[in-house]
Regions:
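Phosphate-handling DNA/RNA-contact segment within nucleic-acid enzymes
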Residues: 1-76
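Acidic beta-strand-to-loop metal/phosphate-binding motif
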Residues: 35, 78-92, 116
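Structural alpha-beta junctions
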Residues: 51-52, 99-114
Length: 135
């Protein structure tokens, strides 16, 4: 079930691939930044909670965060909160990528935290939306 369509010209002469774009929404100087997967998910989560989010195109693209983490460190960010989908507890591929991202954040000197919510909500956007409906 794909939410995004990626356009590429890699099959064309001098074309280019999509790469692994990183999406950012919020204040780049917040003390805490949340890392999730999917730009739309980050935008929805930000709309609900007004926190700062960085979103990967997919969990395996965590290396694309290196320049982002470097800049966030220069901006004074102190905390990185892992907010990957809840399948991080059931999918070994997601769990491995999650741990690699957290190790990278730790190597940059961030205090790293893991966010957990009710597993019946896959993503942070779903969980925040459910909380909004209850209030």
């Amino acid at each position: 079930d794909k939410k995004y369509i990626w356009f590429s010209s890699s099959n064309q002469f001098r074309g280019t691939s999509v790469g692994g774009p990183v999406h950012f929404i919020g204040n780049p100087a917040d003390k805490t930044v949340y890392v999730t997967e999917g730009a739309l998910k980050a935008d929805i989560a930000h709309a609900f909670c007004k926190k700062t989010f960085v979103a990967l195109a997919g969990v395996s693209h965590y290396r694309a965060l290196e320049p982002i983490f470097a800049q966030l460190k220069r901006n004074g960010v102190e905390n990185i909160v892992e907010a990957y989908d809840m399948d991080k507890y059931t999918n070994p591929h997601v769990e491995k990528s999650c741990m690699q991202m957290m190790e990278m954040a730790n190597a940059y000197g961030f205090s790293v935290h893991r966010l957990c919510w009710d597993k019946k909500y896959k993503g942070i956007d779903d969980w925040l939306a459910s909380r909004k409906k209850r209030n």
